[in-house]
């Protein structure tokens, strides 16, 4: 059998056409040190800051320190099976997390992996954990309220959609309870909620998730959990991962509420990473860029303009203080970044005033823009009244004779404090809040003894729901007060039928 020369040349041509001269070039380095959640690698000369790197065992890390001879890497997840001499290669991208509707109702870790035992999350959408905050022209002013269902907040320090409101206070002063109540109150409000638990005990997070399930709030909530047993890098990236998940909804025109519980633990984790990477320590041993750590996170929460879909992301960052000291380094940093703060005071909490909001130290820089008209009318003088009551109270305890006007102010103040108290996990619809505050500010509670106030409040809601639902509907639908004559008449009728407790 003879082989023809044409066949050979045709075969060679065919093979040459198939030849692909593209080479897959991976820049690979060598691990020179590993321990405490960080690694150092030599040979990654072109690596970029915050680039995702892959170790030979499949683990990932983020390039954090770019030095002359080596690269400081924070390891995401387990590091006990990474050894000196192992290979680490560049991926050419920054870290991304899965995003989308499929995450709603799930508990995930900062890498977006499920930790609730309900199977894998099937989503093909991802977003980078670090992204540029919307610019000045991409935003619009905050003008729509985010109702928390907590009278003291909605009346004194209102929160708007797209605002960043700091919740600050000592441990065990009700910070988490405040956030959970706010999430529970978003039911039916078309708001997606994200709860980021940073360094919280596993048992605490489990209780929080159970509470949200009990009230049906997990139907619109994502929980991102980085437990205290996780390496410091996981606690550090958790808030950024949660924000990336929220941005997916915000840029699709939806309203998002994100809670960071709490950023003090993230700052401590970042301090640990920085010290291990031999970065120079500054005040309280924090690195010099700890302000930027929080500012670049919180600036991503915004109310977008109509051109970008008009979505919003409202952030409630938590900071834990030591003995009520809000002038420490991290608290002052976050106060200066946010649009106001709600200060929870331990003394008020243990005195039975819950939520333990210190009205004098708390402020909302958005203010009345984030309130419906009815709430603006009834809560206008509440803060001033409360402040003057606190001032008068300190004089009154000396037992000196008080004139009638001062006594009236003290009586109104005591009733104000009582009205602003609220039981755990009982957020109120805005029309009920307006109703009780209207009754308070228009003197309908002045003759009611302080111990009867809470019973009065509950009976008032039931009475109006049964007999004057049309008046509540006006507040609910228009956001304004109904005709004052009708409202006064209804309150007068209720007061006549209310029985005061016998002493």
Swiss-Prot record:
Q: Which reaction does it catalyse?
A: ATP + H2O + 4 H(+)(in) = ADP + phosphate + 5 H(+)(out)
Its membrane topology is listed as: Peripheral membrane protein
Write down the top EC class of this protein. translocase
Q: What is its main location?
A: membrane
Q: What is its EC number?
A: 7.1.2.2
Q: Which residues cross the membrane?
A: none
Q: What is a single cellular component term in the Gene Ontology annotation?
A: plasma membrane
Q: Name one GO molecular function term.
A: proton-transporting ATP synthase activity, rotational mechanism
User: What does the UniProt entry say about where the protein is found?
Assistant: Cell membrane
- Residues that bind ATP, according to the entry? 169-176
Residues marked Required for activity (site): 362
Q: Which Pfam families match?
A: ATP-synt_ab (PF00006), ATP-synt_ab_C (PF00306), ATP-synt_ab_N (PF02874)
Q: Cite the InterPro entries for this sequence.
A: ATP_synth_asu-like_sf, ATP_synth_asu_C, ATP_synth_asu_C_sf, ATP_synth_F1_a_nt-bd_dom, ATP_synth_F1_asu, ATPase_a/bsu_AS, ATPase_F1/V1/A1_a/bsu_N, ATPase_F1/V1/A1_a/bsu_N_sf
Q: SUPFAM superfamilies attached here?
A: C-terminal domain of alpha and beta subunits of F1 ATP synthase (SSF47917), N-terminal domain of alpha and beta subunits of F1 ATP synthase (SSF50615), P-loop containing nucleoside triphosphate hydrolases (SSF52540)
Q: Which UniProt keywords apply?
A: ATP synthesis, ATP-binding, Cell membrane, CF(1), Hydrogen ion transport, Ion transport, Membrane, Nucleotide-binding, Translocase, Transport
Physiological role: Produces ATP from ADP in the presence of a proton gradient across the membrane. The alpha chain is a regulatory subunit.
Q: Which family does it belong to?
A: Belongs to the ATPase alpha/beta chains family.
Subunit annotation: F-type ATPases have 2 components, CF(1) - the catalytic core - and CF(0) - the membrane proton channel. CF(1) has five subunits: alpha(3), beta(3), gamma(1), delta(1), epsilon(1). CF(0) has three main subunits: a(1), b(2) and c(9-12). The alpha and beta chains form an alternating ring which encloses part of the gamma chain. CF(1) is attached to CF(0) by a central stalk formed by the gamma and epsilon chains, while a peripheral stalk is formed by the delta and b chains.
HAMAP family on file: ATP_synth_alpha_bact
Q: State the name under which the record lists this protein.
A: ATP synthase subunit alpha
Q: Which organism is it from?
A: Lactobacillus johnsonii (strain CNCM I-12250 / La1 / NCC 533)
Per the UniProt record, the lineage of the source organism begins with: Bacteria, Bacillati, Bacillota, Bacilli, Lactobacillales
- Name of the gene: atpA
């Amino acid at each position: 059998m003879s082989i023809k020369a044409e066949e050979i040349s045709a075969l060679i041509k065919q093979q040459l056409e198939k030849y692909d001269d593209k080479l897959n070039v991976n820049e690979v380095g060598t691990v020179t040190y590993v321990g405490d959640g960080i690694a150092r690698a030599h040979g990654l000369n072109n690596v970029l800051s915050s680039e995702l790197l892959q170790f030979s065992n499949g683990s990932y890390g983020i390039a954090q320190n770019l030095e002359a001879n080596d690269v400081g890497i924070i390891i995401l997840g387990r590091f006990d099976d990474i050894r000196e001499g192992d290979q680490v290669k560049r991926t050419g991208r920054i870290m991304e997390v899965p995003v989308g509707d499929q995450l709603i109702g799930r508990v995930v870790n900062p890498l977006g992996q499920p930790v609730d035992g309900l199977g894998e999350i099937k989503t093909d959408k991802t977003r980078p954990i670090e992204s540029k905050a919307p610019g000045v022209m991409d935003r619009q002013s905050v003008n729509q309220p985010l109702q928390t269902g907590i009278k003291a907040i909605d009346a004194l320090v209102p929160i708007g959609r797209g605002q960043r409101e700091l919740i600050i206070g000592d441990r065990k002063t009700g910070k988490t309870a405040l956030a959970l109540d706010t999430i529970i109150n978003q039911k039916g409000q078309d708001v997606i909620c994200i709860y980021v638990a940073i360094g919280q005990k596993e048992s605490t997070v489990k209780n929080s998730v159970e509470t949200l399930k009990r009230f049906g709030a997990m139907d619109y909530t994502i929980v991102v959990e980085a437990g205290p047993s996780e390496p410091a890098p996981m606690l550090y990236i958790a808030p950024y991962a949660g924000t990336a998940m929220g941005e997916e909804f915000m840029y699709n025109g939806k309203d998002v509420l994100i809670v960071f519980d709490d950023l003090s633990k993230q700052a401590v984790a970042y301090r640990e990473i920085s010290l291990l990477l031999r970065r120079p320590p500054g005040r309280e041993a924090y690195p010099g860029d700890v302000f930027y750590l929080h500012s670049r996170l919180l600036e991503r929460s915004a109310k977008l303009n109509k051109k970008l879909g008009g979505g919003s992301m409202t952030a409630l960052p938590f900071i834990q203080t030591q003995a009520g000291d809000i002038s420490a380094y991290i608290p002052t940093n976050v106060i200066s970044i946010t649009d106001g703060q709600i200060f929870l005071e331990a003394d008020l909490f243990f005195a039975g005033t819950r939520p333990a909001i210190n009205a004098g130290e708390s402020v909302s820089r958005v203010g009345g823009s984030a309130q419906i008209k009815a709430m603006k009318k009834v809560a206008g003088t509440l803060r001033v009244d409360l402040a003057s009551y606190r001032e008068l109270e300190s004089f009154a305890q000396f037992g000196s004779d008080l004139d009638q006007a001062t006594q009236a102010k003290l009586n109104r103040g005591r009733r104000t404090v009582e009205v602003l108290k609220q039981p755990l996990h009982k957020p109120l619809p805005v029309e009920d809040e307006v109703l009780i505050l209207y009754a308070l500010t228009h003197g309908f509670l002045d003759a009611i003894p302080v111990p009867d106030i809470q019973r009065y409040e509950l009976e008032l809601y039931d009475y109006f729901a049964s007999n004057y639902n049309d008046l509540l509907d006006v507040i609910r639908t228009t956001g304004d007060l109904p005709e004052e004559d009708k409202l006064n008449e209804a309150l007068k009728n209720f007061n006549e039928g209310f029985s005061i407790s016998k002493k």
